[in-house]
Swiss-Prot record:
Belongs to the UppP family. Keywords: Antibiotic resistance, Cell inner membrane, Cell membrane, Cell shape, Cell wall biogenesis/degradation, Hydrolase, Membrane, Peptidoglycan synthesis, Transmembrane, Transmembrane helix. Its main location: membrane. This is Undecaprenyl-diphosphatase 2. The keyword Cell inner membrane applies. It is a multi-pass membrane protein. Bacitracin is thought to be involved in the inhibition of peptidoglycan synthesis by sequestering undecaprenyl diphosphate, thereby reducing the pool of lipid carrier available. It is an enzyme of class 3 (hydrolase). The gene is uppP2. It holds the Pfam family BacA. GO terms for biological process: cell wall organization; peptidoglycan biosynthetic process; regulation of cell shape; response to antibiotic.
Length: 276
């Protein structure tokens, strides 16, 4: 893997994992648009992807470090019988993580095999854009509540939304923000809940494959560089997005981008079919 391609993929992962535009979809579509081929069976790819996931998760953990300390403290306080908002929210995050954890372990590889056609990925990106636009309308029409007041049923519903992101072209953060809006969260709080909810999933995706990173010691330098670059890009992304949604930013803007990008990619790959 060339240095510039390594930098490109690392930054692409760090940005699109958190922006509601589908990191997996972009990782498949963008290199193909530029005629770059990603060999899924290349020995250096898996340890590299492991490092990218860990870099993203560490960036999220660092950005929300004070929040996580409060959540963990509240969780143990609640176990000791002292009910509190942070403990309730921590339980909500645990419940929201369960659906994707189970389905991801059972079906992720099968889903990847079905959605290997880039034209299907482009269509999924278009649908993702439409859903973001609809989610924006939902957010503006609902009464708002704090994440700490979410019911466990609502948290489970938001967690179910993450399952859609197993399909390339659908965004994990986008779908969970939409579900958070439907549960009555403001755009800012839906984004925060989405990032908190996604942290264990993204972290687990890296940790489960961590042994393979150390088995490929000749690839450690590339993986380490990729992880650092992804962490920087992810940190800057989450910082931007939280400020964006605090300032009345809208999901619809990302929806428009996804539709335009998806239509362009669909047309391109219909005219230039890729080998499958």
């Amino acid at each position: 893997m060339s240095l510039w391609f390594l930098v490109f993929l690392s930054v692409l992962q760090g940005v699109t994992e958190l922006f509601p535009v589908s990191s997996l979809g972009h990782t498949l579509l963008v290199p193909a648009l530029f005629g770059m081929h990603i060999d899924k069976h290349a020995p250096q790819l898996l340890p590299f992807l492991v490092a990218l996931h860990l870099g993203t998760a560490l960036a999220l953990l660092w950005y929300f470090r004070a929040r996580w300390v409060a959540l963990i403290g509240g969780f143990f306080a609640q176990l000791g019988g002292r009910k509190n908002d942070d403990g309730h929210l921590m339980w909500a995050l645990i419940i929201g993580t369960i659906p994707t954890g189970i389905v991801g372990l059972l079906l992720e590889k099968r889903i990847e095999r079905v959605f290997h056609d880039l034209r299907i990925v482009a269509i999924a990106l278009i649908v993702n854009g439409v859903l973001l636009w609809l989610g924006d309308r939902i957010q503006r029409s609902r009464a708002h509540q704090a994440p700490e007041k979410m019911t466990f049923k609502q948290a489970f519903f938001v967690g179910l939304a993450q399952i859609g992101a197993l399909i390339p072209g659908f965004s994990r953060s986008g779908l969970t923000m939409i579900a958070g809006n439907a549960a009555g969260l403001t755009a800012e709080k839906a984004a925060e809940f989405s990032f908190l909810l996604g942290t264990p999933i993204i972290f687990a995706a890296g940790v489960l494959e961590l042994p393979k990173l150390f088995h490929a010691r000749d690839q450690l330098a590339d993986a380490l560089l990729g992880g650092v670059l992804t962490a920087i890009a992810a940190y800057l992304s989450v910082r931007f997005l939280m400020r964006y949604f605090e300032g009345r930013g809208r999901l619809a803007s990302f929806g428009v981008y996804c539709v335009i990008a998806g239509v362009f990619c669909l047309g391109w790959f219909m005219l230039h079919p890729q080998p499958v």
